[in-house]
């Protein structure tokens, strides 16, 4: 998983090479499969299906690739929401359908497109932005099955990094972001701007750089869980750190602003809206904390403030409000 994450942060690769690199390294750790596929998607208009952008595959039958592309094109609005409107999740197709009271045999679109081609089930990691665009890693499975909790968590943690890397690449492509801080291992923060240079930010960024190094020092398979807990894709709900090397050989961590963007209820601060968004997806405080690179206590505090500002008494009200707003949207 660490090798996959490291290649995810390769900003020097163009789009074609980056997607191929993700597919190649995902194939090594894909459950019950010798290959993997990755693709970007746009599920913001469910009635039009799911639009696939860049994609790449490694060691997979061409029939699975073609079936996946066709499946997305023909996805129903209901399946678009089930699979692509859920944040960062990892599951098998059979498990997603089971949780929604159905099965592969009862889902005509999947049964014809994929199961009918000789792939009884498939694994998928989906990393979706609030705008319902994002990145998928998927692979066929030779039997209907569910993933164990440890494997599922490792993939979801990896998804946090791939999601952050993809979001940052898109922002850099639009020239929408610039570095705000630079940390040099052994020296600490050597540059900071836009609030990244104050004492609190300095401590957070230096700690994040040390954690990234400590995670990669735990490279063995038996230490993967510990390493993934240490290394965060987002720091303080704001920055993603990229390792770079200067021409003189100096190693640096460069921090880019990389928080997810979405429509903001005017009452909420940017930090409160992030927590409220993830809570509305049904994410637990501990998982929100991991995704945003903050503590569970900070999540609880920001969520309480957000609920108060929105006039809600419980996080379940936030989930209900989010669902009600989605159902009131035109199906466009």
Model-assigned labels for residue ranges:
Residues 115, 290, 308:
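Short polybasic/polar patches that bind polyanions
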Residues 13-17, 35, 40-43, 136-270, ...:
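Linker/hinge segments immediately adjacent to helix-turn-helix/homeobox DNA-binding domains
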Residues 307-332:
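Basic, Lys/Arg-enriched C-terminal extension of HTH/homeodomain DNA-binding domains
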